[in-house]
Swiss-Prot record:
Protein family membership: Belongs to the fluoride channel Fluc/FEX (TC 1.A.43) family.
Gene source species: Shewanella amazonensis (strain ATCC BAA-1098 / SB2B)
Keywords for the protein's UniProt record, in alphabetical order: Cell inner membrane, Cell membrane, Ion channel, Ion transport, Membrane, Metal-binding, Sodium, Transmembrane, Transmembrane helix, Transport
Main location: membrane
Function as written in the Swiss-Prot or TrEMBL entry: Fluoride-specific ion channel. Important for reducing fluoride concentration in the cell, thus reducing its toxicity.
Name of this protein: Fluoride-specific ion channel FluC
Spans traversing the lipid bilayer: 4-24, 35-55, 60-80, 100-120
Gene: fluC
Regulation: Na(+) is not transported, but it plays an essential structural role and its presence is essential for fluoride channel function.
PANTHER family, alphabetized: FLUORIDE EXPORT PROTEIN 1-RELATED (PTHR28259:SF1)
């Protein structure tokens, strides 16, 4: 039951962060491309790589993994919004933007989760 509370607390923080970052990205970049979602997914993926490497090395306990990895980063990152925004771009005839959105999210997120892990492993 304790993990549920950690996850809920982390989720509340992650959801507010996601909302705040999305609003800021809209103000900075406008509505032409879903930069807010890209930013939260890339940042969250990097942090996820760090958290899971720390957990694997036993430098953080399961409660921190639940709080940050499942709760905070689970609420911060968003596959459903990414999918919906990509579909909307396709429906608007924006094939290049939709393709770019898919490629950037997949390539950048996979790259930074790896880099996050390597950062932690290199410090040990």
């Amino acid at each position: 039951m304790n993990n549920v509370l950690y996850i809920a607390a982390g989720g509340a923080i992650g959801a507010v962060l996601r909302y705040s970052i999305s609003i800021l990205a809209l103000q900075l970049f406008g509505t032409g491309f879903p930069f807010g979602t890209l930013i939260v997914n890339v940042a969250g993926s990097f942090l996820m790589g760090c958290i899971y490497a720390l957990a694997e090395l036993s430098h953080i306990g399961p409660e921190w993994k639940a709080l940050i990895g499942v709760g905070l980063l689970g609420a911060l990152t968003t596959f459903s919004t990414f999918s919906n925004e990509t579909l909307l771009l396709l429906q608007q005839g924006e094939l290049v933007k939709a393709s770019l959105n898919v490629l950037l999210n997949l390539i950048l997120c996979l790259t930074v989760v790896y880099l996050g892990q390597q950062l932690i492993y290199s410090r040990v």
